[in-house]
Design a protein with these regions (language model features):
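Catalytic cores of DNA base-excision repair glycosylases
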Residues: 2-208
Length: 208
C-alpha cells in the first residue's frame, strides 16, 4: 500500500504542481467564510459572491456586528443563505470575543465555531497553518474508494483511513489535488478512464 500511495501522490503532483485552494481570500477569517459558503455550492459561485461581500464588510469586526439580513442578501445565490449568513456572523463574533480575532489552529477550537465541521476545520488547518489535514469532500470520498485507499462513504471514517496511509506532510495537498482530479477526470458519472493517470491503481477500473 505504501508504494501505491507514493505513486498516486507523485502522479497527482505531476498533474497539479500547485496544490492551491480554489477559493479566493485575503484574510484568515475570509477563508473560513468562503468555505462555509461553499457547502452545496460551487467554488466558482462563491468566488463571484465574496468580492462584494468582503468589500461591504472589510473587517472581522464588521462581520461580527453585521445585520444577518444584510449578509443574507449578499450570499443568497450560494444556497441555504439564511443558515450560512447566521453562521458567518456568529462565527465572526466568536472569533472576536473568544479567539482574539484569529481563526484558531486546533481542531477542537475550530469545531466550536458555528457552521464549522471537520471538513472545514481540516481545510483551515491545512491551508492557514500547514498542518496535516484530510479534507473529505465528495470527490475525496469517491476517488479514495475507487482507488482502494478507503472503504465507505462516511467522511470521518474515510478521513481516519486516509490519515493512516497518507504521509502527514502530503495530506493537505493530496486532498486539494484530488478535488481537481475529481472535477476534471474521475467524475462521479462517466469518469474519463481513458485519460486517467491513476488507472493502474484503480480498484474499480480493474474490477476488484
Amino acid at each position: 500500500m505504501e508504494e501505491k500511495v507514493a505513486a498516486i501522490i507523485a502522479a497527482l503532483r505531476e498533474r497539479y504542481p500547485d496544490a492551491l485552494c480554489a477559493l479566493h481570500y485575503g484574510k484568515d477569517y475570509e477563508l473560513m467564510i468562503s468555505v462555509r459558503l461553499s457547502a452545496q455550492c460551487t467554488d466558482a459561485r462563491v468566488n463571484q459572491v465574496t468580492p462584494a461581500l468582503f468589500a461591504r464588510f472589510p473587517t472581522l469586526e464588521a462581520f461580527a456586528e453585521a445585520d444577518v439580513a444584510e449578509v443574507e442578501a449578499y450570499v443568497r445565490s450560494c444556497g441555504f443563505f439564511r443558515h450560512k449568513a447566521q453562521d458567518i456572523v456568529a462565527a465572526c463574533r466568536m472569533l472576536r470575543d473568544e479567539y482574539c480575532g484569529r481563526v484558531p489552529d486546533t481542531m477542537e477550537q475550530l469545531l466550536r465555531l458555528p457552521g464549522v465541521g471537520r471538513k472545514t476545520a481540516n481545510l483551515l488547518l491545512g491551508d492557514l497553518y500547514g498542518k496535516p489535514a484530510v479534507v473529505c469532500d465528495t470527490h475525496c470520498i469517491r476517488i479514495a474508494n475507487r482507488l482502494g485507499l478507503a472503504r465507505g462513504k462516511e467522511p470521518e471514517k474515510v478521513e481516519r483511513q486516509l490519515r493512516a496511509i497518507l504521509p502527514p506532510e502530503e495530506s493537505s495537498d493530496f486532498c486539494h489535488r484530488i478535488v481537481l482530479f475529481g472535477r476534471e477526470v474521475c467524475t462521479a458519472r462517466s469518469p474519463h478512464c481513458d485519460r486517467c493517470e491513476l488507472r493502474p491503481y484503480c480498484r474499480e477500473f480493474s474490477g476488484e
